[in-house]
Regions:
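Beta-loop motif signature
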Residues: 1-50, 164
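Boundary regions of SH3-family modules and the immediately adjacent low-complexity/disordered segments
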Residues: 1-11, 64-90
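Extracytoplasmic
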Residues: 12, 19-23, 46, 54-58, ...
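A mature extracytoplasmic/lumenal domain signature
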Residues: 30, 55, 63-67, 78, ...
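SH3/SH3-like beta-barrel superfamily modules
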Residues: 37-77
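Exported/periplasmic cell-wall-interacting domains
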Residues: 65, 78-86, 134-212
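Post-signal peptide N-terminal regions of Sec-secreted extracellular proteins
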Residues: 70, 75-81, 89, 104-105, ...
Length: 212
């Protein structure tokens, strides 16, 4: 099931985030039999899932798995709720990444986005985890998202092709990003190292809307 995309004109002042208490059942709709298991962790990091709909005793949450945009319903008693005041919007047409806090814009960065052959998929996603970079070229950290490449299924024998937000990789790509952004990646979103560093406090579960 896919939830409606975030209306970029109405960036929410906050988003509720559900932390699973271990692996829990997921449901196609409230009151129906369970049809899946929501993992308690994702690549070793706790599952922190943004809430997109609420009914009495039930929550609809986004999932980090393929297909892109997947959601499921969970019982409210199976999760612990917190709140993130942040939201990220990545505009592929302007090649910029914008960060909002409590509904107000706080950052706007030029970004490297996917090329026409390996585009950055549009849709409504979330930040799943902040992980150490595979090398210093990726910046101080990588923000992994729930977005997955549509053109690549196995990036460098990793078993998947998850869209990340990270540094520019090379000085040449850094120069291409410049002040306006550029289509230079295999789908990931690249930022200047100094801009990426400003995102260190963005928590897992923060919604990310990628628009064209």
């Amino acid at each position: 099931m896919a939830a409606p995309p975030l209306d970029v004109g109405l960036v929410p002042p906050s988003t509720e985030v559900a932390a699973t208490n271990g692996a829990i059942p997921g449901y196609p709709a409230p009151g129906q039999p369970s049809n899946m298991t929501v993992p308690g962790s994702w690549y070793g990091y706790p599952s922190l899932l943004p809430v997109v709909a609420i009914q009495p005793d039930w929550l609809e949450v986004r999932l980090a798995q393929r297909p892109n945009g997947s959601t499921t319903w969970v019982q409210a008693s199976d999760v612990t709720l917190s709140t993130t005041p942040y939201a990220i919007v990545i505009d592929l047409s302007t090649e910029h990444l914008t960060v909002y806090q409590s509904g107000l814009q706080i950052y706007d960065f030029p970004a490297g986005i996917g090329t026409p052959d390996d585009p950055t998929p549009t849709g409504s996603y979330f930040m799943t985890m902040k992980v150490p970079p595979p090398s210093p070229a990726y910046g101080a950290f990588v923000l992994a998202t729930s977005d997955h490449s549509d053109s690549i299924t196995d990036w460098e024998n990793s078993g998947d092709a998850i869209i990340g937000i990270h540094g520019p990789i090379t000085s040449y790509d850094d120069s291409l990003i410049g002040t306006t952004g550029a289509a230079i990646s295999h789908g990931c979103v690249r930022l200047h190292d100094a801009d990426l560093a400003l995102l260190t406090t963005i928590p897992a579960g923060t919604p990310i809307n990628i628009i064209s």
